[in-house]
Amino acid sequence: MQKIIAFFMSIIAFFMNLFGLTPKTPGVTEYKDLAYGSVSESQKLDLYLPEREDKNVGLIVYIHGGAWQSGDKKELTETAKGITRDFGYATASLNYRMLGEKATYVEMLDDIQSALSFIRQKAEENGYKIKCCGLIGYSAGAHLSLLYAFKNVGSYPIPVSYVSSLAGPTDLTDPNFYKNEAIAPLLGSLAGVSGVTAENYEGYAQELLKASPVSYVSADVPKTILCHGTADDIVPYSNAQILSEKMNSAGAFCKFITFEGANHGVLGEDTASSELYYNTLIEWSKTDFGY
């Protein structure tokens, strides 16, 4: 029970202290603002390695949200350090090129690939071997986590054993997205096309689907936790339903956790669902990482 509480408090810190900074955490070796690319200042990550005798470790990677145009890795600082301290897992939180730099989903996925390669190398330089990793993302970060994991099966620098999506977009052609007219140009920019509106988005379906995790579902994708609120007015609940159904049909494993009445924030609004989510993360991490 104590570890469940610790895991809960570590992740909930994201929502309570978005910009909290604290001194070095005992038992954690911290590496801040490591450049994993040379194209943009955005290509930086923070890495936390556990100070433990057994250097064979699991890794949890956090990808921040912010509508692909805002947000920062430091939002996950306390969450990442808490997991490394309490569970002995390596953790990383990364920034990536966003829409303001004219990046599309292609560049964003390239950044995740580069970041994982860099993390593996940095860990090895310090005597660690990363067994596998879990990807955890919220909103836009959840979309990128899913899209990366599904699209790149067979080419991970570090094996991806699971993905956790908190309110993540999964199908950019879902009509329910376009009830909010402001979302259309944003999704178009993400997919690399201009002129997308709530009235004409169907004409861009091919491009939008290329940027949608639902397009890359197969029996080989990592097991996935989908968490979504039924009252989400930014990313429609139907997006999670669509992906869950597609994964089930393909023979992929999907744990779909519904947060009744929750909006886009998801966690903390449904205690029973939150507990189920945290327990699932703990179980999967222990099983996949071996401790």
Feature annotation, model-predicted:
Residues 6-10:
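Sec-dependent N-terminal signal peptides
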Residues 1-4:
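Positively charged n-region of N-terminal signal peptides that target proteins for export
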Residues 12-291:
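Alpha/beta-hydrolase superfamily serine-hydrolase fold, recognizing
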